[in-house]
Amino acid sequence: MLYNLLLPYIHNSHIANLFHYITFRSGLAVLVTLSLSFLIGPRLIKFLQTLQKYGQPIRLDGPESHQAKAGTPTMGGIMIILSSCFSTLLLADLTNKYIWITLFGFVSFGIIGFLDDYAKVTKNNHYGVKGKSKLLLQGIISLIVCILLEYTIDSPSHMLNVPFFKSLSMDLGYLYIFFAIFVIVGASNAVNLTDGLDGLATVPIALTAGSFALISYLVGNLIYSNYLQLTYLPNTGELTIFCASIVGSCLGFLWFNAQPAEVFMGDTGSLSLGGVLGIISVITKHEIVLGIVGGLFVIETISVIMQVYYFKATKGKRIFKMAPLHHHFEKSGWTESKVVIRFWIISLIFVLIGLSSLKLR
C-alpha cells in the first residue's frame, strides 16, 4: 500500500525513494511483523485462553512431560497470519499478482487449520477434522492456486529445475500441475507434523522463509538470475517482502512459543505456513530446493510414513519409539529443549546446503 501511494513521489523524495527498493521494504516488513506480534500477542493469548476451556488437547500416549502442557491455548497461528498479511499489504506492491495469489493460499490454508483446531478444542480431543476431509480441502486450495498461476500469469512455466546442475530441467507439461499440488499439500502437512514441541517448527519455518526471501529476490532480478544461471521470473521479487514478513512474524511468535509455551500455533499456523512455503517454491521454480532447505520437515514426515507402514506390515511392531521423530528422541531420554535446539541446528545445516545450490552447479 505504502509503495503504491509513494510511487508518484519516488523520484522527488529521498524517503519515498527508499520504498522503491525491495531490500528496504523487506527489512521494514520484519520489523513491522515483529512489533505487531509483540503488540497483539498478549491480547490474543488472553482471548484464546478465555475462548478455549481446555486448550490444546494433549495425547495420552505421548511423552509424560507433555501432560504439563494441558490447558495451553492453541490457534496462535492467527497472530502469524494477521501480522504477516498486514505487513505484506502495507509494504508490497499491491498490483503484483503473485502477492495476491500467495495471500489467498496463505489465508485459505489458515482457515483449514482453524477449522481443525476449532474441532479439537470444542470436542476436547486431538483428532479434529477427518484426515481425508482435510486433505481434500488442501488439494482443492492447491488446485485453485495452480489454476490462478496458469491463467493469470504471463507465460506460465511447467519446467522442473534440478539443483546443483547448470542446465538440467524437465518439462512436465500439464503434469506439472499435479506435481505442484503434491508439493504444496506435502509442505503444508510436513510442517504440521513437525510442530510438536515448543518452538520446534517456528525457527525452521523462519529459516526456510528467509531462504525463499533470498531466492525470490534473485530470480526476480535479471542481473542476479543471469549471473547465477537461474530462471528469470519477472515480478517475483515482491515475494521477498512476504517471506520477510513470515520471518518477522515467526520470530515474534517464538517470543510466546518458547519453552514453556504460552500458546501453540496449532494447525492454523502450521498448515498455512507450510502451504504458503510450498506455493512460493512453485512460483519461484525451486520446488526441489524447498525439499532441501526444509529437510527437517521431510525427515519428520518420512519418520511418520515409515512408522505407519512398518506398524501395518509387522502387525504392531514399531521402528521408532514414537513418531514423528522428535517424539522418538524424547522417549529416548532427551529433554525437550535439547531436541528443539538440535533440530534447529539440523535445519540450519539443511538451509546452508539448499542455498549452496544457487551457486554450486
UniProtKB/Swiss-Prot annotation:
Recite the UniProt keywords alphabetically: Cell cycle, Cell division, Cell inner membrane, Cell membrane, Cell shape, Cell wall biogenesis/degradation, Magnesium, Membrane, Metal-binding, Peptidoglycan synthesis, Transferase, Transmembrane, Transmembrane helix
For whether the record's keyword set contains Transmembrane helix, the answer is yes
Enzyme Commission number(s):
2.7.8.13
- Pull one GO CC term from this UniProt entry: plasma membrane
Among the record's GO biological process terms, what is one? cell wall organization
Can you state which reaction this protein catalyses?
UDP-N-acetyl-alpha-D-muramoyl-L-alanyl-gamma-D-glutamyl-meso-2,6-diaminopimeloyl-D-alanyl-D-alanine + di-trans,octa-cis-undecaprenyl phosphate = di-trans,octa-cis-undecaprenyl diphospho-N-acetyl-alpha-D-muramoyl-L-alanyl-D-glutamyl-meso-2,6-diaminopimeloyl-D-alanyl-D-alanine + UMP
Question: Which GO molecular function entries does the Swiss-Prot or TrEMBL record give?
Answer: metal ion binding; phospho-N-acetylmuramoyl-pentapeptide-transferase activity; UDP-N-acetylmuramoyl-L-alanyl-D-glutamyl-meso-2,6-diaminopimelyl-D-alanyl-D-alanine:undecaprenyl-phosphate transferase activity
Where in the chain are disulfide-linked cysteines found? none
- According to the record, the segments passing through the membrane are 28-48, 74-94, 99-119, 135-155, 167-187, 203-223, 236-256, 263-283, 288-308, 338-358
Q: What membrane topology is given?
A: Multi-pass membrane protein
Pathways per UniProt: Cell wall biogenesis; peptidoglycan biosynthesis
Q: Does the keyword Transmembrane apply?
A: yes
Cofactor(s) the protein needs = Mg(2+)
Q: List locations, semicolon-separated.
A: Cell inner membrane
Q: What is the recorded function of this protein according to its Swiss-Prot or TrEMBL entry?
A: Catalyzes the initial step of the lipid cycle reactions in the biosynthesis of the cell wall peptidoglycan: transfers peptidoglycan precursor phospho-MurNAc-pentapeptide from UDP-MurNAc-pentapeptide onto the lipid carrier undecaprenyl phosphate, yielding undecaprenyl-pyrophosphoryl-MurNAc-pentapeptide, known as lipid I.
Q: Which family does it belong to?
A: Belongs to the glycosyltransferase 4 family. MraY subfamily.
Name of the protein in question: Phospho-N-acetylmuramoyl-pentapeptide-transferase
Q: Gene symbol?
A: mraY
